[in-house]
Amino acid sequence: MSSDGNVTGGGGANTVGVTNKPFFCYQCNRTVNVTISPPSSDPTCPICNEGFLEEYDNPNPNQGSGFLNPNPNSIPFHDLFLTLSDPFASLLPLLFPSSSSTTTSSSASIDPNNPSLSGPTRSGRGDPFAFDPFTFIQNHLNDLRSSGAQIEFVIQNNPSDQGFRLPANIGDYFIGPGLEQLIQQLAENDPNRYGTPPASKSAIEALPLVNITKSNLNSEFNQCAVCMDDFEEGTEAKQMPCKHLYHKDCLLPWLELHNSCPVCRHELPTDDPDYERRVRGAQGTSGGNDGDNSGQRSDGDNRTVERSFRISLPWPFQARGPGPAPGDNAETRQEDLD
């Protein structure tokens, strides 16, 4: 066993094998340091003397205790939280860190029929391939943002007029029921659950057929992005307004279900008046469009719709202000941008 955590007795003698380790006590709902001296029995919390503990390996030892303690009087408040003057602007960087500090993952998708998790919500040890709910949620939120989603987090019953405080590790806010509540809300707002409507027939018919030339084969548009087969010189391909090329038999079935380019999500007009109204509202919010409503859109007309949804989170610090009533559930509302 490593001697890094060895405890030195009062007389200066080194007590071999005695170590201090951080644990999370589920009874006290906080991190504690437990002195372990083999071959003793299972570790117990020095505060409540209970054994409902999980060893905690802090990935960032300079960050201090990362666990959220709902009782801010038990340990110094400033050691646990970061003060945020602008809650919404400051919350997003915590949820969406830079790519250099985020593990790359494939597209995340949440099953809305089974959003709950089983097993411990924090895995400081064990199987490196074990499911990590916090990484999963973070990657899923990044996927939503990359597809144009605007995510607004609302803290319910916030008693502070000067902003509010969040855990240094935002993942620690969502533990137990709070974590499952967040997953449920994300599942209800997953754009993959609904998708975009089909492209209009007139827009599909207006897509040009282009002859594949050597210049195409030497460019980034040298293969169909659906079937991934290389184009052959002299053959024809359908071209989207964004200039991406596809085999006709690959693109048309997709456009009969979704109006977006499979690569860049550039959107064709639809026959859905409600959806078109949201598109116009989104474009008006971002600076308007050029007024061209025909099937052929100009290259500068970005029809990627920014989906917006709101995630309501309960105010967790009961000692700092009133929390939601026990029967209250966080609600998520799909917001139109017009």
UniProtKB/Swiss-Prot annotation:
GO biological process, one term: protein ubiquitination
Reaction catalyzed: S-ubiquitinyl-[E2 ubiquitin-conjugating enzyme]-L-cysteine + [acceptor protein]-L-lysine = [E2 ubiquitin-conjugating enzyme]-L-cysteine + N(6)-ubiquitinyl-[acceptor protein]-L-lysine
Extent of Basic and acidic residues compositional bias: 267-279, 298-309
SUPFAM superfamilies found in the cross-reference section: RING/U-box (SSF57850)
Keywords assigned by UniProt, alphabetized: Metal-binding, Transferase, Ubl conjugation, Ubl conjugation pathway, Zinc, Zinc-finger
Molecular function GO terms recorded: ubiquitin protein ligase activity; ubiquitin-protein transferase activity; zinc ion binding
Superkingdom of the organism of origin: Eukaryota
EC number of the protein: 2.3.2.27
Annotated metabolic or biological route of this protein: Protein modification; protein ubiquitination
Residue ranges, annotated region (Disordered): 102-124, 267-338
Zinc finger (RING-type): 224-265
GO cellular-component term (any): cytoplasm
Tissue specificity of this protein: Mostly expressed in cotton fibers, and, to a lower extent, in leaves and flowers.
Stretches with biased composition (Polar residues): 110-121
UniProt cross-references to CDD domains, sorted A to Z: RING-H2_RNF126-like
Post-translational modification: Auto-ubiquitinated as part of the enzymatic reaction.
Broad enzyme group: transferase
PANTHER family named in the record: E3 UBIQUITIN-PROTEIN LIGASE PRAJA (PTHR15710), E3 UBIQUITIN-PROTEIN LIGASE RING1-LIKE (PTHR15710:SF208)
Function as written in the Swiss-Prot or TrEMBL entry: E3 ubiquitin-protein ligase which accepts ubiquitin from an E2 ubiquitin-conjugating enzyme in the form of a thioester and then directly transfers the ubiquitin to targeted substrates. Promotes polyubiquitination of target proteins.
Protein name: E3 ubiquitin-protein ligase RING1
Gene for this chain: RING1
